[in-house]
Structures are given as C-alpha cells and as structure tokens.
C-alpha cells in the first residue's frame, strides 16, 4: 500500500559554465522540477572544461513520462531550457537518462498505518535495518539521511 513517486534524471554535459549561477533551481510549469548544476557543488564533479547539469523529472512508474524514450525526454526538456535561455541545444556535448522507480514517498491518507504494519514485519528480522528515504518512507534531506545512516552504523557496531 505504500506508494512512491518515480524520478527520471536527465544528465546534460555541456562546455558552458555558470548556467544557473546557483547550485540548484526549482521550476514550475516545465517538464522538470529542478535543475542542479553539479560544478557549483564542486568543480571535481566534471572533467576539466565541462559542466554537468542534473535535470530532475518526477513522474509515476510506467506513466507517459516514464515510458518516453531517452531522446524524447531530452528533446522535451532542452526545449524548455532553451526557452528560459539557460542553455542552447548547440551547447550540449552529450546527455544520459537514468530512471528510478521508487524515490519520493507519497503520503496518502492512512499511510502511517501501512508503514507501521511494514515496520512490525521488518522488526521480526534480526540484523535487518530499513534505512534511507525508501526504507524509512521518509522524505528527508541528504543530511538527515546521512545522520540516519551513521546512527544505524553505530547500532550495528555495538
């Protein structure tokens, strides 16, 4: 009964630097939700003289967006990116698509009852820890997820 929103990631390799002038930006009314400029996190994320953009597209598993070809996803996104004057298609060196079926928890009515049932079942297992966004059915930030990971490692070490 626990449901997740899926994620399609479009990675765009470009020679253009400072596309966003920030680490990431959220968008509405676009085929994507967020664009992250990886070089603004660290210049070591890309080869010299290249920049990597991560374009995030949330969808439902096997829906119309999920089932688009890699080329169709790219064309749909680059059209909006060009319209916003962030990047020209001619600036793109290459692109790669990755699909993840279960990323963002969907908090439907009574989800907590279903989650409790799952956790009771998992608690019967020894040496099994359900962690991370998917394992805890929790939409937390990366620092929170890292903390949960460290806490779990401490439990295992004891």
Model-derived features: where do they sit?
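Surface-exposed helix-capping loop/turn segments at secondary-structure junctions
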Residues: 83-93, 158
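Generic beta-strand hydrophobic packing signal
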Residues: 35, 90-96, 128
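A conserved FAD-binding loop/helix module that cradles the flavin
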Residues: 128-157
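Conserved strand-to-helix beginnings and helix N-cap segments that scaffold or border functional pockets
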Residues: 67-71, 108, 142-143
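Mid-domain catalytic core of redox enzymes
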Residues: 1-87, 98, 117-121
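Active-site-proximal substrate-binding core of FAD-dependent oxidoreductases
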Residues: 94-102, 157-158
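FAD-binding beta-loop-beta segment adjacent to the flavin cofactor pocket
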Residues: 37-48, 100-137
